[in-house]
Amino acid sequence: MRFGHFDDQNKEYVITTPQTPLPWINYLGSEDFFSLVSNTAGGYSFYRDARLRRLTRYRYNSSPLDMDGHHIYIKDGDTVWNPGWQPTKTELDSYTCRHGLGYTILEGRKNGVTAQQELFVPKGDACELDRLTLRNDSGTEKELDVFSYVAVSYTHLRAHETELH
């Protein structure tokens, strides 16, 4: 099965299905701040030291599940979905993930609404930025509820290794 392709012009790897065998990760970073972002918006962020200064929660032994991360939820009527498919796993009408040099763009489409989530770490700043762009091509007016979720950790790796799973 083919999961994506290289876009040489834009210097990106384009993933065309969220259901890859394992999370496909892009490493984003500046001098001090780093984020690892998967093709379904999973991953984690840390400041200088991934073991001692992790900012968001991530369990290494759960990595095939890829549930913790940088998630955007969109509620359209009774349907809740994510541009990166996880964690709701709501079937999308279309999906792409573009892992580029210093950024990841996830784009999902559901019921005429396209959501594009761009994640990047700006050079010289110790932060991650998420930019969400919504477009309604459904032909009807929509009222959407949109919210983001990230599991904040402020802990070190040893604390997560001793948790019960």
Role assignments for model-derived ranges:
Residues K110-Y154:
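Acidic, contiguous internal or C-terminal segments within carbohydrate-active enzymes
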